[in-house]
């Protein structure tokens, strides 16, 4: 399939309560309003058997070894990826609310080896664009429902932020378009910036892999 016909693979990352999920939905709605084919994917996908186990972990209903939960997060992405490829080949732009970068950033924040954290997702498709919504963890902590899940603690989020900054540097050196936006701006302003970035992203004929 030519690059003119395939869909784009767009990832939006951010700290918890950064407004990421809202922006993902706004982007999908915008693309559809422009008569483009678009679909939203949220990771973790809590509807699958693996996703339900992750959901229990995040809600602190069960305890799991850090390595085990990291591999479950990765498996949750792998079990969806064939469908994402199929959609992209049909010309559907796929918007991902979190991806492998979150897996690395959060697990490494718990002290797991950096390269080990990256390894389970090697081979997943490389996005055409990654947008990181940057917000001060202390500001995010003031937003509604903060603290309901395991990782929603300021100290943890500060470590995750540093890891995202490291990921951006490493992947940009590999040629990935990885952009940071100030998520403390208004909802409308952030949305407008995201739409501009997505509209102007350069795509290759085929997706590379991580």
Curated annotation (Swiss-Prot):
Q: Indicate whether Chaperone appears among the record's keywords.
A: no
Give the PROSITE patterns listed for this entry. Answer: THYMIDYLATE_KINASE
Sequence positions that bind ATP: 14-21
State the reactions this protein catalyses. dTMP + ATP = dTDP + ADP
Q: Which GO terms describe its biological process?
A: dTDP biosynthetic process; dTTP biosynthetic process; dUDP biosynthetic process
UniProtKB keywords: ATP-binding, Kinase, Nucleotide biosynthesis, Nucleotide-binding, Transferase
Enzyme Commission number(s): 2.7.4.9
Q: Can you name one GO molecular function term for this protein?
A: dTMP kinase activity
Q: In which pathway does it act?
A: Pyrimidine metabolism; dTTP biosynthesis
**Gene Ontology CC:** cytoplasm; cytosol; nucleus
Which is an annotated Pfam family here?
Thymidylate_kin
| UniProt superkingdom | Eukaryota
**What is its biological role?**
Catalyzes the conversion of dTMP to dTDP.
The Swiss-Prot or TrEMBL record describes its family as follows: Belongs to the thymidylate kinase family.
Q: What protein am I looking at?
A: Thymidylate kinase
